[in-house]
From Swiss-Prot:
Residues 244-259 have a biased composition (Polar residues). Keywords: Cell membrane, Membrane, Repeat, Sugar transport, Transmembrane, Transmembrane helix, Transport. Residues 1-6, 64-70, 126-132, 188-192 are extracellular. Residues 28-42, 92-104, 154-166, 214-281 are cytoplasmic. The gene is SWEET14. This is Bidirectional sugar transporter SWEET14. Disulfide bonds: none annotated. Residues 267-281 have a biased composition (Basic and acidic residues). GO terms for molecular function: gibberellin transmembrane transporter activity; sucrose transmembrane transporter activity; sugar transmembrane transporter activity. It comes from Arabidopsis thaliana (Mouse-ear cress).
Amino acid sequence: MVLTHNVLAVTFGVLGNIISFIVFLAPVPTFVRICKKKSIEGFESLPYVSALFSAMLWIYYALQKDGAGFLLITINAVGCFIETIYIILFITYANKKARISTLKVLGLLNFLGFAAIILVCELLTKGSNREKVLGGICVGFSVCVFAAPLSIMRVVIRTKSVEFMPFSLSLFLTISAITWLFYGLAIKDFYVALPNILGAFLGAVQMILYVIFKYYKTPLVVDETEKPKTVSDHSINMVKLSSTPASGDLTVQPQTNPDVSHPIKTHGGDLEDQMDKKMPN
């Protein structure tokens, strides 16, 4: 029975490494597009900064497990390297506002935040207690990472556009979450299994939204000048639904000009009457 658990743990751990590696590479088409256009368009840096911080946390957590966390260390070390490249590319092609915003989040979260966690854990906790504290922090932040696409999902629902929610990323995130869920169950690690339940669920919801809106029949027109450019400018401004005809016809109807034959009114009556009164007999 113990051997079976070990085999399952190694199997799911290796599969988790392979699938997670594919997940880390999923945004490559996005960054190829960014590099070609030399613009971040509507894409954001927050998912990549968050993913980097999450990988750093899991490495620190795995180091507390005395060799049992080797498979967690390997994939998250690779993740740190890949996410760092993404962030560098994002900063390179971002406008000034997005660049400053990204650097602020990176400094506060990945440097000051991570340093604070290490200091607290090293100075105030020991042994199994440190593992529990770190595990709780990892679970909490992983839930936040998995919940981050909720804002993207809101934009997809509002705009009926899946342009900024790549299907490949949603698919592999779902598969990865399921794999790590089973890995956590196999090694009986509550902290690894729990957040991946939420990850699998949200990933499935994203794929459903993609299928629904990929072939949406009445796409809305995006104003190129109003596309989000920074992390804070997340909403994609579209033509309001209330101004779109129910039939889906987006043809702009010309406004009817006022009837020039109608006399112009003034406080004293018709303009024509006023002029007549002022004309000499």
